[in-house]
Amino acid sequence: MGMIESLAGVQDSFGEVQFTDFGLSGPEAFTLSRAAATGGENQELALDFFREYGDGVLLDMLQEKRANLPALAAEDLFSGMLQSRLGKMIVKRAGLKYQTPLQSLNDEQLLACVKIAKWFTLAVEGVMGFDSAQVTAGGVSTREFDARTLESTISPGLFVCGEVLDIDGDCGGFNLQWAW
């Protein structure tokens, strides 16, 4: 599922996340994890489940669904658009009853669903820890090395690479590239 995440206004990323029994996972969750681990308390993550659509377009889509399927229950408002449980979560956050027929929903209620689907917030409670890590941060600061040669600017003749340096690249093999 494509979406964009924003971690406390600090970092944005576009790609896939997975909802699991322990929280979010997937490539974009990994990409944002360093900011989450070092960002302190009271962080919030915002997900946009319809990045490719503006609010008005998404509202038009929901209004059309209401017009074409008036007897459909509100819990199915996002059917065919999102995974069922996720659609229900949006409807619940909007304060709607699951069994309310779409014909009973006004534009303001549909707009509330749009706003939540386009800015779905979750509290960041932490990261899984070292045993679950795919990459670790820490090491010698890259500021202490020539970016072209990886020679130490403090100890000439000393060259380092890989995980000795404080680099945690994006998902997709970028950390492996540094390790070689």
What is each PLM-predicted segment?
Residues 1-104:
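An anion/pyrophosphate-binding glycine-rich loop and adjacent beta-alpha core
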Residues 13, 117, 179:
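Short strand-loop-helix active-site module centered on a catalytic nucleophile
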Residues 33-36, 148-149, 172-173:
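Residue-level detector of alpha-helical segments with a strong bias toward transmembrane helices
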Residues 88-168:
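A glycine-rich dinucleotide-binding beta-alpha-beta segment and adjacent secondary-structure elements
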Residues 167-180:
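A conserved FAD-binding loop/helix module that cradles the flavin
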